[in-house]
């Protein structure tokens, strides 16, 4: 009974987190739209074109999204990085930068662990090509300490905080 209560609490937390992300993003887009509108009605066309060509907002939002994804995922799977590394040969273990939670390789496998196995969907999320995802997956299977054909099945066995 306590375990069900805990699982429901975890679900509620992550549903609330999802809505917070969505509403925060909508609010940012409204602010951005209003800023562009003010620039346009004041006929600052050069500035408008500069803003529209800039990828700064998208880059900032992607960085925030990845950070939030990493935190949420590691909240669900707190031992994921060490469990993942346990599946690799000693000389192939992933060493993250001090400020990084996950890197692109780990995000690919985090998405796989969540059940997203389609390389196209993973590529869309990570804003890279499907061949890049395929290459990362192949490279990691080749670094595995376990049977390379079983590597992704072993990833799926990494347990979350609510699993016993």
Where are these regions (language model features)?
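Cytosolic nucleotide-binding catalytic cores of signal-transduction proteins
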Residues: 57-164
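Membrane-proximal linker segments that couple transmembrane helices to downstream signaling/catalytic modules
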Residues: 2-104
């Amino acid at each position: 009974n306590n375990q069900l209560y805990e699982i429901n609490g975890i679900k509620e937390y992550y549903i609330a987190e999802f809505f917070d992300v969505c509403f925060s993003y909508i609010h940012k887009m409204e602010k951005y739209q209003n800023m562009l509108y003010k620039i346009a009605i004041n006929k600052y066309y050069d500035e408008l074109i500069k803003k529209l060509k800039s990828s700064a907002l998208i880059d900032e939002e992607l960085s925030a999204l990845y950070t939030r994804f990493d935190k949420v995922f590691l909240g669900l799977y707190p031992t994921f990085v060490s469990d993942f590394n346990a599946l690799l040969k000693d000389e192939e273990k992933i060493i993250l930068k001090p400020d990084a939670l996950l890197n692109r390789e780990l995000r690919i496998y985090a998405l796989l662990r969540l059940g997203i196995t389609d390389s196209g969907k993973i590529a869309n999320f990570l804003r890279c090509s499907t061949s890049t995802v395929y290459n990362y997956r192949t490279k990691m299977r080749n670094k595995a300490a376990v049977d390379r054909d079983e590597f992704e099945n072993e990833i799926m066995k990494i347990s979350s905080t609510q699993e016993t």
